[in-house]
Amino acid sequence: TYYTPDYETKDTDILAAFRVTPQPGVPPEGAGAAVAAESSTGTWTTVWTDGLTSLDRYKGRCYQIEPVAGEENQYIAYVAYPLDLFEEGSVTNMFTSIVGNVFGFKALRALRLEDLRIPPAYAKTFQGPPHGIQVERDKLNKYGRPLLGCTIKPKLGLSAKNYGRAVYECLRGGLDFTKDDENVNSQPFMRWRDRFLFVAEALFKAQAETGEIKGHYLNATAGTCEEMMKRAVFARELGVPIIMHDYLTGGFTANTSLAFYCRDNGLLLHIHRAMHAVIDRQKNHGMHFRVLAKALRMSGGDHIHVGTVVGKLEGEREVTLGFVDLLRDDYIEKDRSRGVYFTQDWVSMPGVLPVASGGIHVWHMPALTEIFGDDSVLQFGGGTVGHPWGNAPGAVANRVALEACVQARNEGRDL
């Protein structure tokens, strides 16, 4: 009853594309129906309380199944969920329903959520990014080029004062941002409050010297939501422009709370995706990163890491650009060659700046400006701090390379 090939999808339905690998002997339709049932109203037996509700109104439906080209016994199952199954404005509830129990299902050898279509009616219940791309540019007064960042290394072990010094050196050399590593929270060698104070000092000093607005992603991620908010409040009191959160390890509920605070208080929010590969690396099980990226845009963040296409981490170019567009643009056409399974209309929800980071350095600059365009943050960790003359010359090298590439592109040269 959950496999309904003649179903016409509604504009308000949440649509999901699952890559299903059934156990031997299980027909694909059966597997698709099982996914739809288990992630909506079904249970393993018929219960008398089914008669007290309208299953037709509330059940998920598998409405299309297609074999995956070049893979044996793998199918894409399309499932439509009625909007009423989900709590408004809760990414947490959306995921609990769609990817909750069903991934441990016996009839399936493996299951991967490839894409979600978020209908405008549901998207409108989310605040989305605290500020978005345009507001960020206006706050920073930086236009017509990608922004430059750098993660402070060594990520663990520096004292707060030396950490602030490293931040200052990078920023005075010409970077726009520096970043706490995702593992930097509040450890014995550097407590968060000390770090925040020294970094704020570095920011204002670099700003005064260069005449440009500078930021450092102060990581507010913590063991409890209360502690996280305390750090965010302290950052606001210091007058810094941006803070940071690890949204997968911190959780969507915490992230959404933080995003609301950031919008109310004029803070930009940088999002790191630590733990994403646990979920998205396997080709036939888990969740594709484009789903995690869409979820982040709904939950709220102004920057998110997306890999590089050229550095040390995995990522295919077309597919990466597919979810980069899903983060930045308002309306994205379905395009299977880029992994976009559904046309997505974000109805004016602010966009998220993609952050390219991971093993990139100055030689990659032409490729990066070409691939990511102006609306991006290019983040060079070792690619700045690894400069033989130090942080500031490393920062200068990156800024000069970026300005040169942008100028060449604007003159119509091929990078």
Swiss-Prot record:
For this protein, what post-translational modification is recorded in UniProt? The disulfide bond which can form in the large chain dimeric partners within the hexadecamer appears to be associated with oxidative stress and protein turnover.
Note whether Lyase occurs among the keywords.
Answer: yes
Gene Ontology BP annotations: photorespiration; reductive pentose-phosphate cycle
The record's GO molecular-function terms, alphabetically, read: magnesium ion binding; monooxygenase activity; ribulose-bisphosphate carboxylase activity
Q: Where is this site: Transition state stabilizer?
A: 312
Where does this protein hold substrate? 101, 151, 155, 273, 305, 357
What cofactor does this protein call for? Mg(2+)
Q: InterPro entries given for it?
A: RuBisCO (IPR033966), RuBisCo_large_chain_AS (IPR020878), RuBisCO_lsu_C (IPR000685), RuBisCO_lsu_C_sf (IPR036376), RuBisCO_lsu_fd_N (IPR017443), RuBisCO_lsu_N_sf (IPR036422), RuBisCO_lsuI (IPR020888)
N6-carboxylysine occurs at 179
Annotated Mg(2+) binding lies at: 179, 181-182
Question: HAMAP family per the record?
Answer: RuBisCO_L_type1
- Please give the family membership noted in the entry: Belongs to the RuBisCO large chain family. Type I subfamily.
Q: What does this protein do?
A: RuBisCO catalyzes two reactions: the carboxylation of D-ribulose 1,5-bisphosphate, the primary event in carbon dioxide fixation, as well as the oxidative fragmentation of the pentose substrate in the photorespiration process. Both reactions occur simultaneously and in competition at the same active site.
Subunit and interaction comment: Heterohexadecamer of 8 large chains and 8 small chains; disulfide-linked. The disulfide link is formed within the large subunit homodimers.
Q: What is this protein called?
A: Ribulose bisphosphate carboxylase large chain
The gene name reads: rbcL
